Amino acid sequence: MEVCGEPLIRAAPEPLRDERIQTAELLCADLDLSVSLTPERPADRRRRQVRFNVDPVLITVNPEPRNNQPTARKPPNKDEHGVETDREQSRECDGQQTHEAELNTTLALRAELEEEAEQTFDAEKAVREKLQSSTLTKNHVNSKAAEGLNFPRSQQLYRALVSVSLSRDQLISQALQDRPALAPPTASQNNKFSSPPPEGPDILQFYSPDKMLRETPLLPGDHIPLPRPRPVPRPAHTTFHLHRLHKLWES
């Protein structure tokens, strides 16, 4: 209806109030989402605006050190009903399980054992490394070095030394002594008509009469006396027989 061209404005009736809301004790004043039954409000009261935060909540999960005692998980609150899926996705992306038990693994030890089994054993290298790290070997080397360095003054450090101040005659005599003995000459130096040297090696070069051995046969009839030789008579016409044969051969 319009009165004199102006609309008639009626006041809206006051809504029924719930006594339980007034008497009940609210857990949190910020979570009071109670609204009136009708959207209309009296003109003298300001309208209440209710806003909701719809931004997604980003939560980062940091891995915590695992203990032997299992940690108790808290039940999810009502406000975190939309965050559980984000947590599960973040765990899958990280690839880490923070609240689950993990078995002891021996894969690294197995790989090391397989690598050692594939390698060939070098005995010489092992002995060399053992000698380098051996205390007994070091002590033995130190003792030998001490014996070579620590010597009394009365003892000669060097042996079989040769003097450098020698005369010419001493050097010649020493050289003749050190010179190996040569084989004696086959021909005499006093022989004027010396024969030419043979083409082959001389067999008598190493001949020694003292080392010469003679062998005699041992026959079974050695003890039997042998007959004495006697001249055989020849006829007289054979006296110059050989001389005649020579004459014939020469002619």
Swiss-Prot record:
UniProt keyword annotations, A-Z: Cytoplasm, Cytoskeleton, Protein phosphatase inhibitor
Statement: the UniProt record of this protein carries the keyword Cytoplasm: yes
Subcellular location, record wording: Cytoplasm, Cytoskeleton, Microtubule organizing center, Centrosome; Cytoplasm, Cytoskeleton, Microtubule organizing center, Centrosome, Centriole
Annotated segments matching region Disordered: 58-99, 180-235
Principal subcellular localization: cytoplasm
Family according to the record: Belongs to the PPP1R35 family.
Descriptive protein name: Protein phosphatase 1 regulatory subunit 35
